[in-house]
């Protein structure tokens, strides 16, 4: 799978924000402090500052976006997704929130949701090359997953039609191995061997099993 690009979202003192109260002023200060902490790599402390900013002024949008970004940098994907959704609820036409949420959805394999977010981002900024590239990659990733699922289903369908054929079981094993699904590959390879698959010389050089070649279980199956 290809990787996508999240927009750089780190807003310190948001100059376009007109505070109307001491609480709002304090929210701006907390957000700025959080932004500095992110730059220093102190993400947990930064998150606390962004959360404090939001508690002081729920309408202060930069803190919401920065909170999501900090969670993302900490690889706390679920928390980041929730924070980006909250940011979108607060400001539905924010480009960065939609783009970065799309990146996280793609990371989780939720390609339809990712594609929807990138399309929304492009409705907001139609000429943005980052979002357009992300959309292209998400669509390709979705296509690759669908192709993988179709190949696996085709192999297993043949196995269901020929449940005692070791060559068919072997083909299912190599299909799983090709896509890096180790446990399923070994399950079907063991089945093929029990059914009488004997071409061990080919098994040892079959490129589909390259990712399993150094695994002790593979060594055991290839050299009984």
List each model region and its residues.
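Bacterial N-terminal signal peptides
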Residues: 6-16
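Alpha-helical segment of the N-proximal tetratricopeptide repeat
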Residues: 25-59, 69-73, 150, 154, ...
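Structural marker of alpha-solenoid helical repeat scaffolds
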Residues: 56, 90, 124, 161-162, ...
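Position-specific recognition of the canonical hydrophobic site in helix A of tetratricopeptide repeat
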Residues: 31, 38-39, 65, 69-72, ...
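Alpha-helical protein-protein interaction modules
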Residues: 140, 144-224
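Structural signature of tandem alpha-helical TPR/SEL1-like repeats
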Residues: 40-52, 72-86, 96, 108-120, ...
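Helix-start (N-cap) detector for alpha-helical repeat units in TPR-like alpha-solenoids
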Residues: 26-28, 61-62, 95-96, 129-130, ...
